[in-house]
Amino acid sequence: MGKLREHFMKATEVKLSYKNRLRIEDRPTVTNSFDAYELFLTGWDNDKIELQEQFKIMLLDNSNSCLGIVEIASGGIDYCVVDVKLLFASALKARATGLILAHNHPTGSLRFSEQDKKLTEKLVEIGKFLDLPVLDHLIISCDGYRSYSDVETMPTPKLKL
């Protein structure tokens, strides 16, 4: 056997798997931004919500039932770096058909910054390309939340497929 073939045979195998432990009828359904907020809060560490910025995604199926919530990034006091590849890999692995984004502002501000808006636009673009729509983006604090889709129009993807 040739050296190249021998090395190829020893290459790391990539295996994708996903198993949802909840029955379909037991999964919570998201019908509005408040439902999403309440679900996100159940998995948020209250000790960190005013300490460090975190970014999470909610994975939804065709019926807007929650498949799960994934923490994508955890950062400092006023920022975190979102790995776009990790975000969409998580969604694709779970066979999600829609996403809701959420992050907290440790300052308690519920205003979308310019960086928040640019990131939302970028993720909407990529989601459109992957046929995986980004449905909303929430900012969460101890005192409440703000929904991008409730206060502004979600960005329209510019990609032509």
Kindly label every feature range from the protein language model.
Residues 1-22, 61-63, 77-161:
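Active-site-proximal loop/helix of nucleotide/amide-processing enzymes and allied scaffolds
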Residues 26-86, 90:
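Glycine-rich, small/polar surface segments that engage phosphate groups of diverse ligands
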